[in-house]
Curated annotation (Swiss-Prot):
Lineage: Bacteria, Pseudomonadati, Myxococcota, Myxococcia, Myxococcales
HAMAP family: GlgC (MF_00624)
Keyword Nucleotide-binding found: yes
Name of the protein: Glucose-1-phosphate adenylyltransferase
Catalytic activities: alpha-D-glucose 1-phosphate + ATP + H(+) = ADP-alpha-D-glucose + diphosphate
């Protein structure tokens, strides 16, 4: 049986997710009520039977470190682990200068473990994937590198590495985030084939390429720009079509679902994907569960049923986490993390509320993301007047209001 190792790159700053990333790394941003974004890639690896994982961290990693340490305890008796790897400056007093450099500075981990194949996956996407199927594809083609890819609309090409393949699935072209005239898919001028940022290397080839790149002073030391763009011209580089990946318990509708949640709008929409009656991505797949930390919080509670003055505690088309209290309020098409209290006569619509938030009486909140430890005074209105909201909060062009972690909101705002 082949020896496998997963290197999970979780060190990105996540600037486009500001202010949600002011105090945490992007993979540590809460998602779906009770998860962190990093849980999806780690769950995919665990469900695939790949149980040796190194999580490479760097920027604002305290929240991420705490979460991984509490949630991801595999058994050392069977040499299974999920271990954090901070920037160690093994090659000099410098931070990681790119995703490829993050691997170069930690090559000792790979050479010590001596895996036959090494997965290098990002930690900031939402999806389900059986990585063993990608491994079988890689082995069948005797590839040096296999890149997982997904079709995207041509208008989004500037955000991704765009791939060109031949009839056998071998990479024959690659441009990182093209600014014009992206290569479209054969027979479909409306879509491009985009790299998912998930790579599978034959380990010998990975070490050779990482060392070669580290010795190039002109390199950006980035997997897309530097490794893939160079390697496909010299080595056996193939492209794995993510749409072919079949996960147990997955509906046909969910197949191929993959979201880059690197911007506020994309993050918001991916969360909203979860709350539909028939969601395009379901958290309720017992055959391929998403694992996370388990806290000893009490069940969610819904109180008051006074129809006369509309003081009814209820939630519709929503995800309500443990420890929440909906006290005579209405929550609709929203996601609440643990220990959120929504008080009487308040309404919360199409919003994402992080842990330990208190929403006062008679508040009206719509299309908002509220970070942790925020107390919203009674009668506060958010999301109905964007000009007014912009004076106090961050508002995206699409009208999503973001309230930063721990923000103090004055009564009567």
């Amino acid at each position: 049986m082949a020896k496998l190792l997963a290197m999970i790159l979780a060190g990105g700053e996540g600037r486009r997710l500001d202010p949600l990333t002011r105090d945490r790394a992007k993979p540590a941003v809460p998602f779906g009520g009770r998860y962190r974004i990093v849980d999806f890639v780690l769950s995919n690896m665990a469900n695939s039977g790949i149980l040796k994982m190194k999580v490479v961290v760097q920027y604002k990693s305290e929240s991420l470190n705490t979460h991984v340490q509490r949630a991801w305890r595999l058994t050392s008796l069977l040499n299974q682990y999920v271990e954090l790897v901070p920037a160690q400056m093994r090659v000099g007093p410098k931070w990681f200068e790119g995703s490829a450099d993050a691997i170069y500075q930690n090559l000792n981990i790979i050479t010590d473990e001596e895996p036959d194949f090494t997965f290098v996956f990002g930690a900031d996407h939402v999806y389900r994937m059986d990585a063993r199927q990608m491994l079988a594809f890689h082995q069948d083609r005797k590839a040096d590198l296999t890149v997982a890819a997904v079709p995207i609309p041509v208008g989004e090409a500037s955000e991704f590495g765009i791939i060109e393949v031949d009839a056998e699935g071998r990479m024959v072209g690659f441009v990182e985030k093209p600014t014009s005239d992206p290569k479209t898919m054969p027979g479909d001028p409306t879509r491009c084939l985009a790299s998912m940022g998930n790579y599978l290397f034959t380990t010998e080839a990975l070490v050779q390429e990482i060392v070669r790149d580290a010795g190039d002073p002109a390199s950006a030391h980035d997997f897309g720009k530097s490794i893939v763009a160079s390697m496909y011209q010299r080595k056996r580089v193939y492209v794995y079509d993510f749409a072919r990946n079949v996960v147990p318990g997955q509906t046909e509708r969910e197949r191929g679902y993959w979201r880059d949640v690197g911007s506020i709008d994309a993050y918001f929409q991916a969360n909203m994907d979860l709350v539909a009656v028939d969601p395009v991505f379901s958290l309720y797949n017992d055959e391929w569960p998403i694992f996370t930390v388990q806290y000893n919080y009490p069940p969610a509670k819904f109180v008051f049923n006074n129809e006369r003055d509309n003081r009814i505690g209820r939630a519709t088309d929503s995800l309500i986490s443990e420890g929440c209290i909906i006290s005579g309020a209405h929550v609709h098409h929203s996601i609440l993390s643990p220990k959120v209290r929504v008080n009487s006569y308040a309404t919360v619509e199409e919003s994402i509320v992080f842990e330990n938030v208190n929403i006062g009486r008679h508040c009206r909140i719509r299309r908002a993301i509220i970070d942790k430890h925020v107390d919203i005074p009674a009668h506060t209105t958010i999301g109905f007047d964007h000009e007014k909201d912009r004076k106090h909060f961050h508002v995206t062009e699409s009208g999503i209001v973001i309230i930063p972690k721990g923000m103090r909101i004055e009564a009567g705002r």
